[in-house]
Amino acid sequence: MENAYAAMLRTIVQGLDVVGDRWALLILREAFYGCNRFEQFRQNTGISRATLTRRLNDLVDNDVLYKRPLGSSKRVEYNFTARGLGLFGASLLAQDLENQWREKGDPESPVTVHTVCQQPFKPKAVCRHCRMELKPEDIQWQRIESGYSELIELGNTGNSRRTRDSHSSKSSRVASLIGDRWTLLILIACFLGTTRFDDFSQQLNIAPGILTERLKSLMSAGLMTRETYSSNPPRYEYTLTPKGHASYTFVIALRQWILEGCRDELPAANMIHGPCGQPLKQEIVCGHCEQKPWPRDVVIKND
């Protein structure tokens, strides 16, 4: 079982390096908005040609997108595979976070409509078993040490390209924050109950300077706050704000998609939905009609 658990951790690490990367999140957002050509992605995201080529190839190699030749030319378009379409719920949650985290001066996000009920689309995360709305306080680990083991593995391994980039007008606040490995891991540590600097440092194996910078970034973005618990020397406890807690369902959506797409047999899920006692399976529905949305049914509202 220990070998199987280690395989699960490696699967999560590898998956986050593909779809949790800042640029990959931007590409997926644009793809769900209807972009499928190289130049469309480049113009809408501001990604350099070399970086865009690498990220698109990664998404193709990992069965998220596939290339379709355009006639007799060398040009291709990029479309979602069946597995890639499974990221639609995560993409909807990311867009909702973008709206919640939007600050003065940020570009306006497109308004989407659910054509089934003709209402502005607002995603709602529910338990697939009991259909109750998921709340962070209702999600439990069967063994909390399993959560910390997963966190440590994520911090110690993975692709080093996941580093923080500056926020640009064509970027996304969600992609800029969650698309950074260390920021994402700090958020996950908070979900597991970590609050103190030394505990973050030990669990994540993160350099103090990097940790300080990321904590400041999270506080500046309004996702985290701190309170003094010792004055000599000054020491602080860091906790998530409601704005920070809002990212929980998005992180779960990425994790769940990665594990459900794995062909190897993995251990049963360690996360439990407390009210019904079932292994956590999150599903995204429309907040108005509570129907599961499909890409064809969520469209950008035209003024």
Provide a role label for each language-model segment:
Residues 60-74, 221-233:
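Beta-hairpin "wing" of winged helix-turn-helix
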Residues 57, 66, 98-101, 261-262:
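Catalytic cores of eukaryotic secretory-pathway lumenal/extracellular enzymes that build
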Residues 99-163, 263-303:
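C-terminal regulatory/oligomerization modules of transcriptional regulators
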Residues 56-57, 215-216:
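Short, hydrophobic-biased segments on the C-terminal half of alpha helices
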Residues 20, 71-91, 232-251:
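Basic, amphipathic "hinge/linker" alpha-helix immediately C-terminal to the N-terminal HTH DNA-binding motif
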Residues 10-48, 108, 126, 169-210:
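N-terminal helix-turn-helix DNA-binding core of bacterial DNA-binding proteins
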Residues 1-16, 152-175:
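Short, Lys/Arg-enriched N-terminal segment that forms or immediately precedes the first helix
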Residues 23-26, 65, 87-98, 110-112, ...:
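Short, structured motif recognition centered on aromatic/hydrophobic residues
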